[in-house]
Amino acid sequence: MNIERTAASSAKRLRYALLCAVALNLALVVARVLLYTPLLAQRNAPLFVLEPVVLLLIYAVIASVMTAKRGERWHTVRRTGTIIGLITGTMWVVNLSLETFSRFSGILATAPFLLGAFVLWGVAGGIGAWRTGAAFPGIAAAIMAAMICVLITVAYGFLLTYTSLPRLERDLANSPDFLRSGWDDLRAFAIANTFDSGFSHLLGALIVSTIFGAIGSGVGLLLNRGAQRRPSPISLTDA
């Protein structure tokens, strides 16, 4: 009974944390637009604002569902997803910092952080499936890890439009995307580009974590079944 109460309490805390993270990201988007309203005058600019907002609301729904589930399986999903999510979120914040502020921003410098996170999401899937003996909890653990990771990363990226906007503008001044966009406001483009990147990360994380989570779950199930088939020392002695 105490174990069930502890699991329910941890699920509530996680739900609160995830919904707060979603609310923070939404607030950062809305406040950024209000602080620079010329953004909305650019072509298709409202779309760049709405895309991450819609996905963040979807994240809130998914988080609410996954933290409302009861039982040992879902406790495993949440615990595994949270640990891997915090680790990979830290990795992606480091990666984004390198891309923004460091000379070491090439693919060789950032790929280990990006691809490493994908692999760890697969590990979350493997752990979830191995511990529960079912594929779906493994995939759910990978998705949970990815959601936590990307909510942290996107919040950090949105914060950069407040703290480092001139640097973002300089980096995009000669960007082919800016030159092709037809926009005449570099600051607005830098903000919209950040929103678009946030949208891409939010969407991509769900897709990639599902794929890697499924692969990891397959491996986890094989390990689980292999462990079940292995005879125990007691049974060997009795034989």
Question: Which ranges hold each PLM region?
Answer:
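Functional transmembrane-helix hotspots
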Residues: 152-181
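Cytoplasmic juxtamembrane interface segments
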Residues: 121-157
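Short, highly charged, low-complexity non-transmembrane loops/tails of multi-pass membrane proteins
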Residues: 171-177, 227-239
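Hydrophobic alpha-helical transmembrane segments
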Residues: 50-53, 180-214
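Transmembrane alpha-helical insertion/packing segments
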Residues: 2-120
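Alpha-helical transmembrane segments of multipass membrane proteins
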Residues: 28, 87-95, 117, 121, ...
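Transmembrane alpha-helical segments in integral membrane proteins
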Residues: 60-66, 121-125, 198-229
